[in-house]
């Protein structure tokens, strides 16, 4: 059985998180060679740029490889995707052209990214993996799945559809991974996940991963799992180290645009992400920034899948430097060069705050998060500070020196 987690695009030079690890699994492996992994998988790991396992990888890969159900919680950017990807690749039998591992992710972008990681780590293994996501051609999806893929990564709706059509065969699946479990088990996906789960073999191994795991999610997850190993980062450590957090007082909503333009006139920014709470606001802000001669890209869930992929590609390559988006991007998308995250709107759900600001400091990279605060937002800001045991200070005049 296998397990798999989220891995960034560059090597893990500074991957060791500062966070406190609590674990019911006490074996710790501080290098990949001691994990008794396949030779061709090790080649893929080192070829991908990894030198040593991160804290979560040191603890979670082996119980996953040994077939245990695992609840793993770690900060965004600590190598979660690699954790379950490595465990999956260690366990699959590539001589059987059937789906042996099924990974669900909350967004198409995250599913696509995970699939890329599996293919990269499994480069020397003749592994077949497919991203089964909405917004793509159903017939083509069905054709690829019918021909057999060892690892399928997808969004819940499309995966359920493909199982129903009998083109995604489930009888060989030995591992079921839920990435970003808090989001996946939230109201929107809970029923779909349960529908998929019911169609899997009864002895399937289950892995749940997320940056945040509220008690109710842990409770729900236990319905799926047998005697799971828990590997958790203490909640107060979850605000990412290396991210400087500030707020800017903006008296009224309609003053935000001027404040944003002033910021961009002042700062020299490699790349930045601006979060708004609604798709409409994303479109509106994109239009207003363009009128003020700022070059920006926008992405949200109303867009065609092809358009979203083009925008993400441009942003990853650096040809687009400012991306305005909703929480669609907040979960798990690796964009390595992001130096600044701006919460144009504070997230309506405090759980999303860490997913948003985690965009700026993956793998120990330094980053700055700036929150625009109206008078109505003060209570929400206070709530976020208390929830994460953190302090968000007023933005200093020398902000340019910090980015």
UniProtKB/Swiss-Prot annotation:
| Motif Q motif: chain residues | 30-58
User: Which Gene Ontology molecular-function terms are recorded?
Assistant: ATP binding; ATP hydrolysis activity; RNA binding; RNA helicase activity; SMAD binding; translation initiation factor activity
The record, for InterPro entries, names:
DEAD/DEAH_box_helicase_dom, EIF4A_DEADc, Helicase_ATP-bd, Helicase_C-like, P-loop_NTPase, RNA-helicase_DEAD-box_CS, RNA_helicase_DEAD_Q_motif
Tell me the superkingdom of the source. Answer: Eukaryota
List this protein's GO terms for biological process: cytoplasmic translational initiation; female germ-line stem cell asymmetric division; germ-line stem cell population maintenance; mitotic cell cycle; negative regulation of BMP signaling pathway; oogenesis; pole cell formation; positive regulation of proteasomal ubiquitin-dependent protein catabolic process
Q: Which residues form the Helicase C-terminal domain?
A: 242-403
* Binding site residues for ATP: 74-81
Assigned keywords, A-Z = ATP-binding, Cytoplasm, Helicase, Hydrolase, Initiation factor, Nucleotide-binding, Protein biosynthesis, RNA-binding
Q: Where is this motif: DEAD box?
A: 179-182
Q: Name one GO cellular component term.
A: eukaryotic translation initiation factor 4F complex
Q: Which Pfam families match?
A: DEAD, Helicase_C
Question: Which reaction equation describes what this protein catalyses?
Answer: ATP + H2O = ADP + phosphate + H(+)
Q: Where is the Helicase ATP-binding domain?
A: 61-231
Instruction: Spell out the subcellular localization from the entry.
Output: Cytoplasm; Cytoplasm, Cytoplasmic ribonucleoprotein granule
Might you give the EC number(s) for this enzyme?
3.6.4.13
- Ranges where the record places region Disordered: 1-20
Q: Does the keyword Chloroplast apply?
A: no
Q: Which PROSITE patterns match?
A: DEAD_ATP_HELICASE, HELICASE_ATP_BIND_1, HELICASE_CTER, Q_MOTIF
Its family remark reads: Belongs to the DEAD box helicase family. eIF4A subfamily.
Note the subunit structure.
eIF4F is a multi-subunit complex, the composition of which varies with external and internal environmental conditions. It is composed of at least eIF4A, eIF4E1 and eIF4G1. Interacts with tud and vas. Interacts (via multiple contacts) with bam; the interaction is direct.
Physiological role:
ATP-dependent RNA helicase which is a subunit of the eIF4F complex involved in cap recognition and is required for mRNA binding to ribosome. In the current model of translation initiation, eIF4A unwinds RNA secondary structures in the 5'-UTR of mRNAs which is necessary to allow efficient binding of the small ribosomal subunit, and subsequent scanning for the initiator codon. As a result, promotes cell proliferation and growth. Binds and antagonises the bam-bgcn complex; probably prevents bam mediated translational repression of shg/E-cadherin. Involved in germ cell formation.
Task: Spell out the protein name for this chain.
Answer: Eukaryotic initiation factor 4A
Q: To which species is this protein native?
A: Drosophila melanogaster (Fruit fly)
């Amino acid at each position: 059985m296998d397990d798999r987690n989220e891995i960034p695009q560059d090597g893990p030079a500074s991957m060791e998180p500062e966070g406190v690890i609590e674990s019911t699994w006490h074996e710790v492996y501080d290098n990949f060679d001691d994990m008794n992994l396949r030779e061709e998988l090790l080649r893929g790991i080192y070829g991908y740029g990894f030198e040593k396992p991160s804290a979560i990888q040191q603890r979670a890969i082996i119980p996953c490889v040994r077939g245990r159900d695992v609840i793993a919680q770690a900060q965004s950017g600590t190598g979660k995707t690699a954790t379950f990807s490595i465990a999956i690749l260690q366990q699959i039998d590539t001589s059987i052209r059937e789906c042996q591992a099924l990974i669900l992710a909350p967004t198409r972008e995250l599913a696509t990214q995970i699939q890329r990681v599996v293919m990269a780590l499994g480069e020397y293994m003749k592994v077949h993996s497919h991203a089964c996501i909405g917004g793509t051609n159903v017939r083509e999806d069905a054709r690829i799945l019918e021909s057999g893929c060892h690892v399928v990564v997808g969004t819940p709706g499309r995966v359920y559809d493909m199982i129903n059509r009998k083109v995604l065969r489930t009888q060989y699946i030995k591992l079921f991974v839920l990435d970003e479990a808090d989001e996946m088990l939230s109201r929107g996906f809970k029923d779909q996940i349960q529908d998929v789960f019911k169609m899997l073999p009864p002895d399937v191994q289950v892995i749940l991963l997320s940056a945040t795991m509220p008690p109710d999610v842990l409770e729900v997850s236990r319905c799926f799992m047998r005697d799971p190993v828990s590997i958790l980062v203490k909640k107060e450590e979850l605000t990412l180290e290396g991210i400087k957090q500030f707020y800017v007082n903006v008296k009224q909503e309609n003053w935000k645009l001027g404040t944003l333009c002033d910021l961009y006139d002042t700062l020299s920014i490699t790349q930045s992400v601006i979060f708004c709470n609604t798709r409409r606001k994303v479109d509106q802000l994109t239009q207003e920034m363009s009128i003020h001669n700022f070059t920006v890209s926008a992405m949200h869930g109303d867009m065609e899948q092809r358009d979203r992929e083009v925008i993400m590609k441009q942003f990853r390559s650096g040809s687009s430097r400012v991306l305005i988006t909703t929480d669609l991007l907040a979960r798990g998308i690796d964009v390595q060069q992001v130096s600044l995250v701006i919460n144009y709107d504070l997230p309506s759900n405090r759980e999303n705050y860490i997913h948003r600001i985690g965009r700026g400091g993956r793998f120990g990279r330094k980053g700055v998060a700036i929150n625009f605060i109206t008078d109505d937002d003060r209570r929400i800001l206070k709530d976020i500070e208390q929830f994460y045991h953190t302090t968000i200070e007023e933005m200093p005049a020398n902000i340019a020196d910090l980015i």
